[in-house]
């Protein structure tokens, strides 16, 4: 018994087992009919579990649902957490119904964020417990106290660092690629050795590859496979054989090539072997030796290690010259695929024009070659028959055997008046001692004359040929037609002069067309609204034109339409074209009565089938001669059909002119006009047939009784209006618009009236303005699109946008004012007035948010109500006791009615709802060099601020490659006035180019550096939802002992329901339930997700932004440009020449400050894949079929286990891609996605230089100079210098320094004294830096920073040093050239110190001596022997003579 008691005591003393965790505190209880399932979850600070404890009373069985939390970070409250959107501390909260959901928090305790650039570590410091998160290319988070460091190891880190309430995003890059360092850090090598190896990895690769190739060739030389290299060595051996036989001195003893340091050999170069040198010499001298055997030498080279070693070095160099380093290739980088639709618009336009240009080029090419061939044939004929060609200018006289000039020649029988005198100038000798002989000189000047005339004719033919390409006919000028009062035939559309036709005009909106016409002074500014309202489609534009009732208005609208579609009537020159579709279809769908009877008549066949059009005129008088006789109705119908076809072909003024001629019965003028059209378009066969048919119909007698269609009366012009349509004829205008003004900063308007004016150019009604104020001196403003609002304070005053009069009325330009003063104007009642009513205002509302906002120019307290309207409220804590809870008074005691404020007036609000803000890198531009020195010498290595010297801030990291460019402008006696340079530069971030500006004579004037500081394509994205993996399932369930499941199961928003019937059975039922195969278990569930991925959707179109900078020695300036608007300033003229268009993805996902793209569900779409569970405004949505099970307990309720609720395919999100070229800027609720690695096009730049009087520059300049430099050695920023130069003359000065200077030549003027230079030094030059300017030596003081930063910080949209270095040096051999050779020579430099020059001289002398002995001396001796042979041969020849 005692044992039993002891066992019972021990059992009672042991702790009761609890699931998930022991202990914990109850945070919430909720007795309910529905029970929750057991859930155990962990967040960043605690663990939490829920369980159901059943209780029973008189009313039934209930569940006491309990939530228990156990803290893992017990002191996390010390950091003063606060709930915030986008926080980095995930905490699971318990709802009133014990449903679990995740919320985000941040700590309020202050935290200092810094970056140590020398150790590449992020430094975080705080005074209490705090939490940090680093997201981006690396992801780390945790709790800390005091100070912690996080090491960066990626080559370029794009990070968002969050600590406490602070968040900052920045871009940081190392000075070398870190993939090699990270790899070697995993081995036993120390960090310093790993860094040294990676810094010289290129030369290590070169040496290793050379050795591998050499070993491979050495192994192959042991086999016959080595002879595969024969094609490589045969040309070398053959070339060596030629040099051996012809260029080298021979040994006197053996006859082989001169060998001063070795004995005579036994093997000849031909392969023969001799025991003695005498036999060898006899073999060589007797001519028995066939010469150097190249094939034998090539075989020896294939087996030899010497050629193998040389070949291995050459092969390694060639391989590494064309291979990109592995380090500069980003793993997983997306490759660009260019689609045709993404090509620039100008390239598409070029594709449309290429066929025409190709035809012109072919014709020009054929004619040019034809002229060349003809010229060559004539040249050959001239060479063979010169005398016959020369006979045009001179004749041969057989009597005196001389040539005589034909000019002034007279014949006397067989003699002439020029006998005894030749064209060469020789006279016949009277004594007969000397006889004249015909020579080449007799006709040489006539041959030259003929050739000169031929060349002149040839050049004239070439000029005529090239000029014929650009010949263009002229039409009637538009401005001339506007001056005519009535319409004329030459002022209709087909005959208007449209100038040069460019097809890109079709893409211009009519607003731009109006601006162009206004710039050409073709229209008035009052005509522009009418032109801008022309419909964009052609059919709508033609209808719009025909609706105009006066000649000048219709002509103006038609001219604008033809200016856009400038080839509209040019299409009529042929038998097809987009502008001919309507009238040709109209003819095909209508039949002439005559053609029904005579379908084979040529005219009918032309109209219906398009054939026999050329002969349609010939049989009008044959088959159709008597058809219309006595048939006036058929005559009228057919002629109206032909005229209607002309109407569909020539709309607008042409149709109006035809209607005018018909109404006047001016048949002759009508026929004359149609003939003009036929002459204008002679190649249009169908149009010619219609015109001829109309002319034939006019010749018939029925024409006198012709009744044209009533349709033509609608096309007749009406008289131009002299009063506004809204005014009666008897009323007179009361406003004096001759004194009209348009005052600025007017927020209220009294006596508002609408104004109608007639354009002085076209007479069109202009009603885009309103008038305010006194009728004797009214003010006019642009008519508002939303009307005007009556002020709530003054009923006679009107405002814009709302009733508070916060917005200025838009003023009218001075150009429009001048036009209004010259025009006829009337006032009218303004109809769009919104009256102020008391019911529009409220005294209180349910507040949605509150804060202080910028309203116009003021800072007002604003309340946003539940109806999303904004109101002024000086009190934001006064409840309205007459309303429901949550209503706040807008005024003290709800005494004043407040009216809504237009949202566009509200900006920059500080709402009370917590919203996170993310800071960026601060860039400070310092103008003074001394202040810059102080800023960088304070060792603020942990600061997240960048300090830039203002005068050199726009220079690249690496000195650019220079190109020579000639200065342009107006040349004068002193130099160039209005000088400028033009160039092109790719729109790629980090691209730089140097310009060495020269005069037209080639004189170097100055250096300028162009730098694309940033180039990006970006879009703004708004948040849709968050998603993540399922960490648990919220469940509510109940059960019925008997009966079916409920038809409708109550559930909360976003919850899914489940049910299962026949769950009651023996041993599986609650206490008191006696049922078998009956009852039901039912409930609802919802996933608890951990917020890991946020999905955003694109809200704005892609914005292309490029910042281009030019830097001189004394100034620097930048401009931002986009592909749409060219930039024209006093310093710059910049525009995109070509534009590459890119499209950013519509939906992106953000995880840990990293962009992911791919197949992601949109908001409200729950298809299989990433994002099919969505958390929106704290509610989780999804779909699926819940899977659940239950455990039976004897006489107790069932334990429900929900195994799956939503279909969550979050695993698919892991397959999303992370584009390497995308960068991210986060903001409250939105993100900006930036693509910064694309070439956005080509920028055409024109830099204005002003007057450059280089011809007056002095060669010897007397100046006083001093300088100050500061910076660092082998770092990112290098050294910046400020020079103070004083001189009295202008000069172009070269700059020479022991270090690399970015500008090699500067322009010095008396008016400018401060000049800035950027210098790169690889070694410390001393306490001063020597710079020579125009032979003036400047010892600039030098203050160097000892810090050696290995990490560079940069704003998100700018490039870093490592990327510019990769772009400049893309191959391994380039890296070897920049670093490897220096590394090879570095040990010798350290060994010899200052005597390195003597060592280099000694080595070079030895190499030169060896070259002289083995190469130069044999060649010289061979040359000496050759000269001696020639001397001996000369002496032998002299003896023979």
Curated annotation (Swiss-Prot):
<keyword id="KW-1162">Viral penetration into host cytoplasm</keyword>
<feature type="topological domain" description="Lumenal">
    <location>
        <begin position="327"/>
        <end position="365"/>
    </location>
</feature>
<keyword id="KW-0945">Host-virus interaction</keyword>
<feature type="signal peptide">
    <location>
        <begin position="1"/>
        <end position="13"/>
    </location>
</feature>
<dbReference type="GO" id="GO:0044003">
    <property type="term" value="P:symbiont-mediated perturbation of host process"/>
</dbReference>
<feature type="topological domain" description="Cytoplasmic">
    <location>
        <begin position="222"/>
        <end position="305"/>
    </location>
</feature>
<dbReference type="GO" id="GO:0044167">
    <property type="term" value="C:host cell endoplasmic reticulum membrane"/>
</dbReference>
<keyword id="KW-0472">Membrane</keyword>
<feature type="topological domain" description="Cytoplasmic">
    <location>
        <begin position="387"/>
        <end position="452"/>
    </location>
</feature>
<keyword id="KW-0812">Transmembrane</keyword>
<feature type="topological domain" description="Lumenal">
    <location>
        <begin position="14"/>
        <end position="200"/>
    </location>
</feature>
<dbReference type="GO" id="GO:0039654">
    <property type="term" value="P:fusion of virus membrane with host endosome membrane"/>
</dbReference>
<keyword id="KW-1160">Virus entry into host cell</keyword>
<feature type="glycosylation site" description="N-linked (GlcNAc...) asparagine; by host">
    <location>
        <position position="1177"/>
    </location>
</feature>
<feature type="transmembrane region" description="Helical">
    <location>
        <begin position="306"/>
        <end position="326"/>
    </location>
</feature>
<keyword id="KW-0946">Virion</keyword>
<feature type="transmembrane region" description="Helical">
    <location>
        <begin position="1396"/>
        <end position="1416"/>
    </location>
</feature>
<comment type="similarity">
    <text>Belongs to the orthobunyavirus envelope glycoprotein family.</text>
</comment>
<protein>
    <recommendedName>
        <fullName>Envelopment polyprotein</fullName>
    </recommendedName>
</protein>
<dbReference type="GO" id="GO:0055036">
    <property type="term" value="C:virion membrane"/>
</dbReference>
<dbReference type="GO" id="GO:0019062">
    <property type="term" value="P:virion attachment to host cell"/>
</dbReference>
<dbReference type="InterPro" id="IPR026400">
    <property type="entry name" value="Bunya_nonstruc_pro_NSm"/>
</dbReference>
<keyword id="KW-1038">Host endoplasmic reticulum</keyword>
<keyword id="KW-1170">Fusion of virus membrane with host endosomal membrane</keyword>
<feature type="topological domain" description="Cytoplasmic">
    <location>
        <begin position="1417"/>
        <end position="1441"/>
    </location>
</feature>
<keyword id="KW-1168">Fusion of virus membrane with host membrane</keyword>
<keyword id="KW-1161">Viral attachment to host cell</keyword>
<keyword id="KW-1040">Host Golgi apparatus</keyword>
<keyword id="KW-0732">Signal</keyword>
<dbReference type="InterPro" id="IPR014413">
    <property type="entry name" value="M_poly_OrthobunV"/>
</dbReference>
<feature type="glycosylation site" description="N-linked (GlcNAc...) asparagine; by host">
    <location>
        <position position="490"/>
    </location>
</feature>
<dbReference type="Pfam" id="PF03557">
    <property type="entry name" value="Bunya_G1"/>
</dbReference>
<feature type="transmembrane region" description="Helical">
    <location>
        <begin position="453"/>
        <end position="473"/>
    </location>
</feature>
<dbReference type="GO" id="GO:0016020">
    <property type="term" value="C:membrane"/>
</dbReference>
<feature type="topological domain" description="Lumenal">
    <location>
        <begin position="474"/>
        <end position="1395"/>
    </location>
</feature>
<feature type="site" description="Cleavage; by host signal peptidase">
    <location>
        <begin position="473"/>
        <end position="474"/>
    </location>
</feature>
<dbReference type="InterPro" id="IPR005167">
    <property type="entry name" value="Bunya_G1"/>
</dbReference>
<keyword id="KW-1133">Transmembrane helix</keyword>
<keyword id="KW-0325">Glycoprotein</keyword>
<comment type="function">
    <text>Glycoprotein C and Glycoprotein N interact with each other and are present at the surface of the virion. They are able to attach the virion to a cell receptor and to promote fusion of membranes after endocytosis of the virion.</text>
</comment>
<dbReference type="GO" id="GO:0044178">
    <property type="term" value="C:host cell Golgi membrane"/>
</dbReference>
<dbReference type="Pfam" id="PF03563">
    <property type="entry name" value="Bunya_G2"/>
</dbReference>
């Amino acid at each position: 018994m005692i044992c039993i008691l002891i066992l019972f005591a021990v059992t009672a003393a042991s702790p009761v087992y609890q699931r998930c965790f022991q202990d914990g505190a109850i945070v919430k209880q909720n007795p309910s009919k529905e029970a929750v399932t057991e859930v155990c979850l962990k967040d960043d600070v605690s663990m939490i579990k829920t369980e159901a404890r059943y209780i029973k009373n008189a009313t039934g069985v209930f569940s006491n649902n309990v939530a228990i939390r156990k803290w893992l970070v017990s002191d996390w409250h010390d950091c003063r957490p606060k709930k915030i959107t986008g926080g980095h501390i995930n905490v699971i909260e318990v709802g009133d119904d014990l449903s679990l959901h995740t919320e985000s928090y941040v700590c309020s305790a202050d935290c200092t964020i810094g970056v140590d650039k020398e150790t590449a570590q992020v430094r975080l410091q705080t005074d209490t417990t705090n939490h940090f998160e680093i997201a981006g290319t690396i992801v780390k988070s945790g709790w800390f106290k005091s100070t912690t460091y996080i090491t960066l190891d990626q080559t370029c880190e794009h990070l968002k660092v969050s600590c406490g309430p602070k968040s900052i995003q920045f871009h940081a890059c190392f000075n070398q690629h870190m993939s090699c360092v990270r790899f070697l850090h995993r081995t036993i090598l120390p960090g310093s050795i790993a860094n040294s190896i990676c810094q010289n990895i290129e030369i290590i690769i070169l040496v290793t590859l050379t050795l591998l190739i050499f070993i491979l060739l050495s192994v192959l030389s042991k086999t016959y496979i080595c002879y595969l290299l024969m094609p490589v060595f045969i040309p070398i051996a053959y070339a060596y054989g030629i040099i051996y036989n012809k260029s080298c001195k021979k040994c006197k003893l053996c006859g082989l090539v001169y060998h001063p340091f070795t004995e005579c050999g036994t093997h000849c170069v031909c392969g023969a072997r001799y025991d003695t040198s005498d036999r060898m010499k006899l073999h060589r001298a007797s001519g028995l030796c066939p010469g150097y055997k190249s094939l034998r030498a090539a075989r020896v080279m294939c087996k030899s290690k010497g050629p193998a070693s040389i070949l291995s070095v050459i092969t390694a160099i060639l391989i590494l010259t064309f291979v990109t380093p592995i380090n500069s290739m980003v793993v997983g980088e997306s490759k660009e695929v260019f689609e045709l639709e993404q090509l620039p618009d100008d390239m598409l336009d070029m594709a449309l024009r290429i066929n025409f240009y190709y035809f012109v080029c072919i014709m020009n090419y054929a004619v040019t070659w034809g002229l060349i061939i003809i010229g060559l044939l004539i040249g050959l004929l001239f060479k063979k028959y010169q005398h016959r060609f020369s006979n045009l200018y001179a004749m041969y006289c057989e009597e005196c055997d001389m040539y005589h000039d034909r000019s002034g020649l007279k014949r006397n029988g067989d003699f002439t008046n020029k006998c005894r005198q030749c064209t060469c100038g020789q006279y016949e000798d009277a004594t007969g001692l000397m006889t004249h002989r015909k020579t080449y000189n007799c006709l040489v000047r006539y041959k030259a004359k003929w050739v000169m005339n031929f060349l002149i004719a040839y050049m004239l033919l070439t000029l005529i040929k090239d000029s014929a390409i650009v010949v263009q006919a002229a039409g009637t000028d538009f401005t001339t037609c506007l001056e005519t009062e009535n319409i004329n035939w030459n002022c209709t559309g087909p005959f208007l002069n449209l100038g040069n036709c460019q097809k890109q005009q079709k893409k211009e909106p009519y607003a731009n067309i109006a601006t162009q016409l206004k710039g050409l002074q073709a229209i008035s500014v009052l005509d522009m609204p009418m032109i801008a309202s022309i419909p964009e489609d052609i059919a709508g534009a033609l209808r719009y034109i025909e609706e105009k009732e006066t000649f000048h208005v219709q002509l103006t609208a038609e001219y604008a339409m033809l200016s856009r579609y400038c080839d509209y009537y040019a299409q009529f020159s042929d038998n097809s074209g987009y502008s001919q579709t309507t009238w040709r279809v109209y003819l095909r769908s209508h039949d002439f009565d005559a053609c029904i009877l005579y379908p084979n008549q040529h005219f009918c066949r032309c109209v219906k089938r398009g054939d026999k059009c050329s002969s349609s005129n010939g049989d009008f008088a044959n088959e159709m001669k008597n058809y219309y006789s006595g048939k006036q109705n058929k005559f009228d119908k057919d002629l109206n059909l032909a005229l209607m076809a002309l109407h569909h072909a020539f709309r607008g003024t042409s149709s109006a002119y035809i209607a005018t001629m018909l109404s006047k019965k001016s048949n002759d003028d009508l026929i004359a006009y149609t003939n003009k059209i036929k002459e204008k378009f002679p190649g249009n066969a169908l149009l010619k047939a219609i015109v001829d048919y109309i002319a034939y119909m006019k010749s018939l007698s029925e024409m006198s009784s012709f009744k044209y269609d009533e349709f033509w009366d609608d096309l007749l012009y009406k008289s131009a209006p002299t009063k506004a349509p809204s005014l009666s004829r008897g009323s007179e205008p009361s406003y004096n618009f001759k004194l009209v003004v348009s005052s600025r900063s007017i927020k209220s308007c009294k006596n508002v009236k609408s104004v109608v004016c007639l354009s002085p150019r076209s007479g069109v009604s202009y009603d885009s303005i309103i008038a305010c104020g006194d009728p004797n001196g009214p003010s006019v403003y642009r008519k508002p699109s939303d009307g005007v609002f009556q002020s709530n304070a003054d009923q006679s005053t009107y405002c814009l946008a709302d009733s508070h009069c916060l917005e200025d009325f838009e003023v009218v330009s001075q150009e429009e004012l001048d036009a209004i003063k010259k025009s006829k104007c009337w006032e009218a009642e303004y109809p769009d007035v919104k009256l102020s009513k008391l019911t529009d205002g409220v005294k209180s509302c349910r507040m949605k948010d509150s804060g202080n906002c910028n309203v116009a120019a003021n800072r007002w307290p604003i309340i946003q109500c539940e109806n999303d309207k904004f109101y002024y409220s000086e009190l934001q804590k006064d409840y309205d006791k007459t309303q429901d809870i949550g209503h706040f008074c807008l005024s003290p005691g709800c005494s004043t009615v407040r009216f809504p404020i237009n949202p566009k007036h509200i900006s920059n609000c500080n709402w009370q709802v917590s919203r996170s803000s993310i800071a960026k890198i601060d860039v400070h531009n310092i103008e003074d060099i001394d202040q810059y020195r102080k800023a960088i010498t304070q060792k603020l290595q942990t600061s997240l601020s960048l300090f830039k010297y203002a005068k050199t801030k726009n220079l690249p990291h690496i000195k650019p490659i220079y190109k020579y460019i000639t200065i342009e402008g107006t040349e004068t006696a002193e130099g160039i006035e209005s000088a400028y340079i033009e160039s092109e530069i790719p729109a790629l971030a980090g691209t730089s180019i140097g310009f060495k500006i020269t005069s037209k004579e080639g004189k170097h004037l100055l250096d300028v550096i162009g730098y694309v500081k940033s180039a990006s394509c970006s879009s703004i994205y708004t948040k849709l939802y968050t998603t993540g993996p399922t960490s648990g399932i919220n469940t509510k369930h109940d059960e019925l002992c008997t009966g079916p499941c409920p038809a409708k199961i109550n559930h909360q928003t976003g919850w899914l329901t489940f049910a299962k019937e026949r769950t009651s059975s023996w041993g599986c039922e609650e206490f008191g339930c006696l049922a078998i195969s009956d009852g039901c278990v039912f409930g609802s569930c919802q996933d608890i997700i951990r917020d890991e991925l946020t999905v955003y959707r694109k809200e704005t179109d892609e914005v292309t932004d490029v910042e281009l900078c030019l830097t001189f020695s004394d100034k620097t300036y930048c401009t931002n440009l986009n592909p749409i608007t060219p930039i024209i300033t006093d310093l710059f003229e910049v525009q995109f020449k070509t534009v590459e268009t890119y499209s950013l993805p519509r939906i992106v996902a953000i995880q840990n400050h990293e962009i992911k793209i791919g197949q992601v569900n949109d908001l409200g779409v729950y298809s299989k894949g990433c994002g099919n569970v969505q958390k929106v405004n704290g509610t989780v949505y999804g779909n699926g079929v819940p899977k659940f099970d239950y455990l039976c307990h004897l006489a107790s309720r069932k334990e429900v286990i929900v195994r799956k609720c939503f279909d969550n395919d979050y695993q698919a999100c892991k397959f999303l891609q992370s584009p390497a070229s995308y960068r991210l800027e986060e903001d409250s609720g939105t993100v900006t996605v930036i693509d910064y690695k694309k070439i956005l096009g080509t920028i055409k730049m024109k830099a204005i230089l002003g007057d450059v009087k280089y011809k007056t520059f002095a060669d010897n300049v007397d100046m006083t100079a001093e300088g100050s430099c500061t910076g660092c050695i082998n770092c990112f920023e290098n050294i910046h210098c400020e020079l103070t130069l004083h001189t009295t003359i202008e000069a172009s000065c070269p700059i020479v320094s022991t270090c690399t200077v970015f500008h090699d030549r500067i322009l010095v003027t008396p008016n400018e004294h401060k000049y800035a230079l950027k210098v790169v030094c690889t070694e410390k030059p001393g306490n001063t830096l020597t710079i020579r300017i125009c032979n003036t030596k400047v010892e600039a003081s030098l203050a160097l920073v000892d810090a050696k930063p290995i990490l560079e910080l940069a704003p998100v949209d700018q490039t870093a040093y490592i990327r510019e270095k990769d772009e400049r040096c893309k191959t391994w051999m380039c890296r070897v050239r920049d670093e490897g050779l220096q590394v090879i020579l570095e040990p010798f430099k350290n060994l010899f110190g200052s005597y390195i020059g003597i060592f280099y001289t000694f080595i070079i002398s030895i190499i030169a001596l060896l070259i002289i002995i083995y190469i130069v001396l044999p060649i010289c001796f061979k040359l000496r022997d050759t000269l001696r042979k020639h001397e001996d041969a000369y002496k032998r020849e002299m003896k023979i003579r």
